[in-house]
């Protein structure tokens, strides 16, 4: 609001419009002086500050202003004023007086729809803090500070009162991330050395650079002009012959390129966390490119937002000659999928050397080469190479992490170069079903052997049971009935027959035991059976001796009884042999 409008309002309040309007707007005649001073202040806004303070430091007499807690000055009416003036204090709540510098765009309050008035009143004798504009929000990139001192430069020894050393204090209230006083000092010292360039990170003397650039915008000129952030890595030596292959456009190369770039970015993050370089603003703000120091091969890859019709071009450049690569086949090549044999390398040393042309071809092809491919040392068939030569490392692994060209397959004096067309991936080249079939077959053989062992044990148990039942039957058949022992002659006749029967069965029993021992061939079984047979023989020999003594005594009685008793013996043998059969 300009000064002319303020004067116009003052004239309206002083006219015949009524004291009510004046009281309603300004609360009393004393406000006229205030607004006249305000008009002067608005006109003299560009004048020097001391003049403004002198003009506003002398308010009209009879008026005392109280500064409320919110900075709004409430006028205090003197006792000489009327009661109507004191009653109009309720209407003064709509008048907001701002003390201090008023900036444009600040909220302005009006009363009852009237045009808002900015009141710039300087209160004398009262000093306020700096009310200048402050930056809104929190600067996340700004380093922390304690009382204006950067956090990494604060000396912990300068604190007189160290509350974390007090008994019962929780160290995590003062140090984050597991730091304590000593480790924090060491960390600050290391950060200072890194930022000053004094901290030297050891890097192996190799020259392989892998550049992974993220955030593709489609403009190759701008991408080339972007600054690159560098982090050093070590890479195993390359074992491939490298060249500049033509660009390959395939959807599989896009997918494998994205996964490889993701792996590279995750490994960079882990490396930064390990060496504490995540604090540097370059690594934190720029997605940038990553140069990996390795061998003399430079691999550049771009990953970002890809469209459906956009193809990824992978370029491999080499500074090394072919002879250097050929002489470096001592270590295995990097980035091979697990379980897949490197098809471009010679066979392992445990295989027989490749035969000459005069000898017969081997029955088993070398690992990684299909059956339709002629073995090394034999000339290939005339004409174009068979299609089985195509799925090599160039096609199956072309869009992987390294994308290096593979060596050609040497067969005799002819070397077949790899074709750059798409071909099946690594799992299709290696037939893993044979390995699983071998393991399954071996498990089946083991189960079959276990079943055979169980069957043998069952047969042995059955043989033992049969032998026991036979012995029981023999004892039952040869055991005398009460009717047999009617006379001494019959008792003698039975004992003589039992003696002959034992002698007859002894030979057959020994044969069966020998056959059983030869069939089982187990030490425990042999020991057990031999002890059983020995005890049986001892028992039988004792019985035979007792029978012979008894027979000698009976022979003295009568010769007639012997002759009479010798006749029914064959009959008894025939009758007893019939049920045995």
Swiss-Prot record:
GO MF terms, alphabetically ordered: enzyme regulator activity; RNA binding
Modified residues (Phosphoserine): 84, 86, 88, 280, 479, 483, 487, 541
Assigned keywords, A-Z: mRNA processing, Nucleus, Phosphoprotein, RNA-binding
Region feature (Disordered): 1-95, 211-282, 320-581
Region annotation (Sufficient for interaction with PAPOLA) ranges: 1-110
Domain of life assignment: Eukaryota
Protein's UniProt keywords contain Nucleus: yes
Predominant subcellular localization, coarse grouping: nucleus
Region (Sufficient for interaction with AHCYL1): 478-535
Keyword Protease: no
Phosphothreonine, modified sites: 481
Bias type Acidic residues, positions: 43-54, 80-94
Region feature (Necessary for stimulating PAPOLA activity): 1-332
Family according to the record: Belongs to the FIP1 family.
Complex formation: Component of the cleavage and polyadenylation specificity factor (CPSF) complex, composed of CPSF1, CPSF2, CPSF3, CPSF4 and FIP1L1. Found in a complex with CPSF1, FIP1L1 and PAPOLA. Interacts with CPSF1, CPSF4, CSTF2 and CSTF3. Interacts with AHCYL1 (when phosphorylated); the interaction is direct and associates AHCYL1 with the CPSF complex and RNA. Interacts with PAPOLA; the interaction seems to be increased by the interaction with AHCYL1. Interacts with NUDT21/CPSF5; this interaction occurs in a RNA sequence-specific manner.
Stated name of the protein: Pre-mRNA 3'-end-processing factor FIP1
Organism: Mus musculus (Mouse)
Lineage, opening ranks: Eukaryota, Metazoa, Chordata, Craniata, Vertebrata
């Amino acid at each position: 609001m300009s000064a002319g409008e303020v004067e116009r309002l003052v004239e309206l309040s002083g006219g015949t419009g009524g004291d009510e309007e004046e009281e309603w707007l300004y609360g009393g005649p004393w406000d006229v002086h205030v607004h006249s001073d305000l008009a002067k202040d608005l006109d003299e806004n560009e004048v020097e500050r001391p003049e403004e303070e002198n003009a506003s430091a002398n308010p009209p007499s009879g008026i005392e202003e109280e500064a409320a807690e919110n900075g709004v000055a409430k006028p205090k009416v003197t006792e000489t004023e009327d009661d109507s003036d004191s009653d109009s204090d309720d209407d003064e709540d709509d008048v907001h007086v701002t003390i201090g510098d008023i900036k444009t765009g600040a909220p302005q309050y009006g009363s009852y729809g009237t045009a808002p008035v900015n009141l710039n009143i300087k209160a004398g004798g009262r000093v306020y803090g700096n009310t200048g504009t402050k930056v809104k929000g929190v600067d996340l990139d700004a380093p922390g500070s304690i009382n204006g001192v950067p956090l990494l430069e604060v000396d912990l020894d300068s604190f007189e009162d160290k509350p974390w050393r007090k008994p019962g204090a929780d160290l995590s209230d003062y140090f984050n991330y597991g730091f304590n006083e000593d480790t924090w000092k060491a960390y600050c010292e290391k950060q200072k050395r890194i930022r000053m360039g004094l901290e030297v990170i050891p890097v192996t003397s190799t020259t392989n650079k892998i550049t992974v650039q993220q955030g593709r915008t489609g403009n190759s000129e701008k991408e080339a002009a972007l600054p690159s952030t560098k982090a050093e890595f070590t890479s195993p030596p390359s074992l491939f012959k490298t060249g500049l292959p033509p660009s390959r456009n395939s959807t599989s190369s896009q997918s494998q390129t994205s996964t490889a770039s993701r792996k590279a970015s995750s490994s960079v993050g882990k490396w930064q966390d390990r060496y504490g370089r995540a604090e540097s603003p370059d690594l934190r703000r720029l997605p940038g490119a990553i140069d990996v120091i390795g061998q003399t091969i430079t691999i550049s890859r771009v990953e970002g937002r890809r469209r459906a019709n956009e193809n990824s071009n992978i370029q491999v450049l080499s500074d090394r000659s072919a002879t250097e690569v050929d002489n470096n086949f001592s270590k295995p090549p990097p980035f091979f999928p697990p379980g897949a044999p490197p098809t471009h390398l010679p066979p392992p040393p445990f295989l027989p050397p490749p035969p000459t042309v005069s000898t017969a071809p081997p029955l088993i092809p070398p690992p990684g080469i299909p059956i339709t491919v002629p073995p090394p040392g034999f000339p290939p068939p005339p004409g174009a190479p068979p299609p089985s030569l195509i799925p090599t490392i160039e096609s199956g692994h072309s869009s992987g992490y390294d994308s290096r060209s593979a060596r050609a397959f040497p067969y005799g004096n002819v070397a077949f170069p790899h074709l750059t067309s798409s071909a099946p991936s690594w799992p299709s080249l290696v037939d893993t079903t044979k390995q699983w079939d071998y393991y399954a077959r071996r498990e089946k053989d083991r189960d079959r052997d276990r079943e055979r062992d169980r069957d043998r044990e069952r047969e042995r148990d059955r043989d033992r049971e049969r032998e026991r039942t036979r012995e029981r039957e023999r004892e039952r058949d040869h055991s005398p009935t009460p009717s047999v022992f009617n006379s001494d002659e019959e008792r003698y006749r039975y004992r003589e027959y039992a003696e002959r029967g034992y002698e007859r069965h002894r030979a057959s029993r020994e044969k069966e035991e020998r056959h059983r021992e030869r069939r089982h061939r187990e030490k425990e079984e042999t020991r057990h059976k031999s002890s059983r047979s020995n005890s049986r023989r001892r028992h039988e020999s004792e019985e035979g001796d007792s029978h012979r003594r008894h027979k000698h005594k009976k022979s003295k009685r009568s010769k007639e009884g012997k002759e009479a008793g010798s006749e029914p013996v064959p009959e008894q043998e025939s009758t007893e042999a019939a049920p045995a059969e």
